A protein has these predicted regions:
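Short peripheral tails and domain-boundary helices/loops at the edges of structured domains
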Residues: 527-542
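Non-cysteine beta-strand/loop elements that form the S-adenosyl-L-methionine
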Residues: 68, 287-305, 395-404
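Short glycine-rich, flexible loops that bind phosphorylated cofactors or substrates
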Residues: 118, 158, 405-406, 517
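Short proline/glycine-enriched turn/loop segments at secondary-structure junctions
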Residues: 281-282, 517-522
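Divalent metal-binding segments
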Residues: 2-8, 13-276, 295, 300-335, ...
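His/Asp/Glu-enriched, well-ordered alpha-helical/loop segment
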Residues: 205, 333-344, 348-374, 378-379, ...
Length: 542
């Protein structure tokens, strides 16, 4: 193509050395040169187009190391059941009812975003509550964590869920005082409502794979892609890929609609299939690539299913839950490591994190790989001594700062004072661990600048602050966590995450310099343009 462009006229943050430059020269989809305007003009040639930033800030496109894009698109199409509009049970029922009134007579009503701590009743809705919306059709609301679904009586009946239905391995059917199902399904129990042809996660993770028509799933994925790109996110890791996601990504790519760069971690139910295929390392292209294996150790802090042998504040005998017996999880991680795969294991509670660290240690004793880059997804509540072990083993924690903004107050209620160590970024930095930040969208929104603000301030939705100054990180450290460190966590640092010659020209233009504005104004910094492959994104073709 020989498309040559020079971008200049505002602060340019490279996330590499030197940290700031005057200009960037692009050749087609790649960065040709960074440095002075004179040098970039010389590198690009006299016929190069020149783009004036007009004082705005240029930096690398954001890299979100933990997302669920198809789930984001699907949940965005459902009823938004989160604050500030929904803070009471009556408001939830009323809003779901409005959606019901606009649907065909038997179409299901789905919602997303409920958290018990946000409702006036301080509990999750149960079947009797959702029966107020409808009894002649399915009504279902996914918990904000993605690890639970609340359903009405019709959904329970349609799927044969009764008092005699046992809890599946890795899941739980909440029951009332008589033993009947209450209508709240956790983790692998969501398998029970995805139908005979739907994805089954078994005891390998929460079932976020709600069925829909294939062509509809492509549209939902493309809608999510637009949301991410408009937030300045150009590369993501999809942290739970099954055949549903794979088929949808392939369809979007084949239709020429995939602009986002996606690294896929396939769910551990597929480990033996990967071994049988011999798929031991990265496979794909610059926009869609297989990256490794996703596993689950425990549940979620927001759903009170994260695993702590010491229990929770409200009940020291309530420990949360594990998806696998410890030896089974360690075996899966050892097998994936021996085969050559990078793993990302969901672990929130310190007791679950201990199982993962032991598994990685055993795997390295078996086959020494110095650059394994095994990850712990979320890694919200490691014990203080585990931080050093994480550094020693070379494990990468992948955190989501917006989570402590959304649910930090509820965590203090559930865990007590130890919740102030949630997402211990300061401890990570002092141990030599570079923070990797992400959104886990749709659990939180896809806005990286809100996440940066949350990581720097540790402020919650209700205005309290988690931890002291020692747990905070700088704006620059947080920005690196959403660019070059996010790229490194998914083995893409050779291609994205910083402005360096030879890398892909994925750029974001911001209204202001995030390193110069007051910290309290970080969330107000706007993404004004997103570039992929050396040109502004053409949203009309997506």
């Amino acid at each position: 193509m020989n498309r040559r462009t020079v971008v200049t006229g505002g602060p340019i943050l490279t996330m590499a050395e030197p940290g700031r430059v005057e200009a960037v020269a692009l050749l087609d989809e790649r960065i040709l040169h960074v440095g002075s305007l004179e040098d970039c003009r010389a590198a690009a040639g006299r016929d190069a187009a020149e783009v004036d930033l007009g004082g705005r800030t240029l930096m690398p496109g954001f890299v979100d190391a933990h997302t669920h894009p198809l789930m984001l698109g699907q949940c965005a199409a459902w009823v938004d059941c989160a604050p500030p509009e929904v803070t009471t049970l009556d408001a939830l029922v009323e809003k779901l009812g409005r959606r019901r009134d606009g649907l065909p007579p038997t179409a299901p009503v789905w919602g997303f975003g409920v958290h018990h701590g946000d409702l006036d009743v301080k509990r999750n809705p149960v079947a009797a509550d959702l029966d107020r919306v409808a009894t002649n059709r399915v009504v279902a609301v996914m918990h904000r964590s993605g690890h639970g679904v609340m359903v009405n009586s019709r959904c329970l009946a349609d799927n044969g869920i009764t008092r005699d239905t046992p809890d599946p391995a890795g899941g739980r059917i909440e029951r009332d005082e008589t033993g009947a199902p209450s209508g709240v399904l956790w983790d692998a129990a969501i398998d029970l409502i995805t139908g005979p042809e739907g994805v089954k996660t078994l005891n390998h993770g929460p079932n976020i794979h709600i069925p829909d028509a294939p062509e509809r799933l492509v549209e939902l994925l493309c809608n999510a892609q637009t949301m991410l790109l408009r937030a300045g996110v150009t590369s993501v890791t999809d942290c739970q890929v099954t055949r549903r996601e794979m088929e949808t990504y392939l369809s979007a790519r084949d239709e020429g609609r995939l602009a986002l760069r996606v690294s896929m971690l396939t769910l551990s139910t597929l480990l033996e299939a990967l071994v049988e295929l011999g798929l031991r390392s990265r496979l794909g292209d610059d926009h869609l690539a297989f990256a490794g294996l996703k596993l689950y150790a425990d549940g979620t802090l927001t759903g009170l299913t994260a695993y702590f042998e010491s229990g929770y504040r409200f009940d020291p005998c309530h420990h949360g839950q594990l998806y696998h017996e410890p030896e089974e999880l360690r075996r899966l991680i050892r097998r994936a490591h021996r085969f050559g795969l990078q793993t990302g294991t969901h672990a929130q509670g310190d007791s679950a994190i201990a199982i993962v660290l032991q598994a990685v240690r055993e795997a390295l004793d078996d086959v020494d790989r110095t650059d394994h880059r095994h990850r712990i997804e979320h890694c919200g509540m490691p014990a203080p001594e585990q931080v050093g072990e994480i550094a020693e083993l070379g494990v990468i924690p992948v955190n989501q700062p917006t989570h402590h903004y959304l649910v930090g107050d509820a965590l203090v209620e559930a865990l007590g004072e130890r919740a102030h160590r949630y997402n211990p970024y300061g401890e990570f930095v002092r141990a030599g661990i570079a923070p990797v930040l992400s959104s886990d969208t749709p659990v939180s929104g896809p806005d990286p600048l809100e996440a940066v603000w949350a990581a720097v301030t540790r402020t919650t939705r209700y205005g309290s602050v988690l931890g002291d100054e020692a747990q905070r990180i700088t704006v620059e450290q947080a920005l690196r966590g959403y660019t070059i460190e996010g790229a490194r966590a998914t083995r893409r640092e050779h291609a994205v995450g910083s402005l360096e010659p030879g890398k892909l020209a994925d750029l974001v233009v911001l209204s202001d310099d995030p390193l110069a504005v007051p910290v309290e104004d970080l969330r107000a910094v706007r993404v004004e343009e997103t570039w992929v492959d050396g040109a502004p994104v053409d949203y009309a073709r997506l």
